[in-house]
From Swiss-Prot:
The gene is mmm1. Its main location: endoplasmic reticulum. Residues 460-474 have a biased composition (Basic and acidic residues). It comes from Aspergillus terreus (strain NIH 2624 / FGSC A1156). Homodimer. Component of the ER-mitochondria encounter structure (ERMES) or MDM complex, composed of mmm1, mdm10, mdm12 and mdm34. A mmm1 homodimer associates with one molecule of mdm12 on each side in a pairwise head-to-tail manner, and the SMP-LTD domains of mmm1 and mdm12 generate a continuous hydrophobic tunnel for phospholipid trafficking. One of its GO terms (molecular function) is lipid binding. This is Maintenance of mitochondrial morphology protein 1. Residues 83-96, 398-407, 440-450 have a biased composition (Polar residues). It is a single-pass type I membrane protein. Residues 271-282 have a biased composition (Pro residues). It is found in: Endoplasmic reticulum membrane.
Amino acid sequence: MNFQQSAIPPFSFLLSFTQGFLLGQLSVVLLIGAFIKFFIFGEAPPPPSRGLSHRASTHRRSNSIYTISTNEAGSRSLREKPSTSNVLRPVPSSSTNTRSILRKTYYGAIPTNPSKHGRHRVHHSSHQPESLDWFNVLIAQTIAQYRQTAYLLKDEPTSSILSSLTAALNNPEKKPSFIDKITVTDISLGEEFPIFSNCRIIAVDDPNSDGGRLQALMDVDLSDDNLSIGIETSLLLNYPKPGSAILPVALSISVVRFSGTLCISLVPASTPPLHTPSPSPAPQTADGARTQSQPENNSSNPNQQSADASGAPPKTSPKSNVAFSFLPDYRLDLSVRSLIGSRSRLQDVPKVAQLVEARVHAWFEERVVEPRVQVVGLPDLWPRMGRTGVRTGEDSETGSNAASRSAISADLGSSLRDDLDQGPDGLRFRGPLGARPQFDSVSRSSSFNVETGGFHGHPMTREDSRGAISDDFHMPGSLPDGAVGN
């Protein structure tokens, strides 16, 4: 009995080992088969598309209440005739606030949260900062064009940068009486370009706009440049009589390095203008009163009424603006060299350098350092024929332009042939004698007009009822001038 009990465990041990071995082999076979089926013979996933369809499938936009109401309004507009005062559909504030803009542009910005003291904190976006390499190239091209234009206009008496700086430095309303006329002796616009980097979008609280406003912050750095200006003047001692003593002074100011954080934001047209405190209020003059009353008088100006009738926007219409400024933690390093006196000259006086640097910093902070901002109006980007230009050169003739021009010439040619077949009231072709068709004398006199001494410059002319030749080009079937004017 004891022998049987001792013989059972080896049999059960062998049976469990066999089952485990078979189970392990089966699992290995299944893994190998799954690997061969799904990883070797499986179809590769399609490459990610960069088109708009993939972007639309990745970022699902939920249908808002405004979309539903817009569709309903569109269906109602087919049945009901809208009034003339309700043609432009209103834009809800929910589609123009900060959160809606960030959601529709897929920019992950963190909204502002109230702090313990009741103020709103400014949170940076979770979006990665941008390098702005493309922006640096555009800014560099713009600055290079300004430098080249300033050099080309150096000899102009009114448009040169020298005359502008001289007039600004010698402004009688700002220049003290103890300083003589300031003469600009040297101007250097530099050779390097500012480098912008680390651009990020933040949401700040603004009581004038719904949901706050967006602000772009970017770091700017300008170093190792020779941006400088040199001036000469004289200090006048007007006691006991004017011009009792004269002390010549020569200064040279150079920008060694500038770095800071630039803030750019958009000011909508409906927002009231930003109030920028000035250190000294401007005096009320008769010219200023006349300037303030000028817009009222312009309302009765016939030129302005004709401009409004032609479709151009009025000059008094509100415009969107761009506000930019620098944070107070900027860095502006200057190099000031001075030369005082005529005989025994004092060179590079430290006190003069401190005074000049303090004045330059004060001038800069009074204009573009927070909380003061510079507001610049955005230009009118509506396409107009008055601003239309054509690139010169043979390489600018692209295939699309050539195709469009050939299509236009083909249409004109077909219309000319139709008009010539209709009768003598169509367009006349002026060409050399060898190009004349064999017409009779009547048709020849009405269709061809050859001038002695050379042919007319315009390829097409029109002969009126009196037999005179006019250079005006009129398309067949067009309205007369009187009908167009009415």
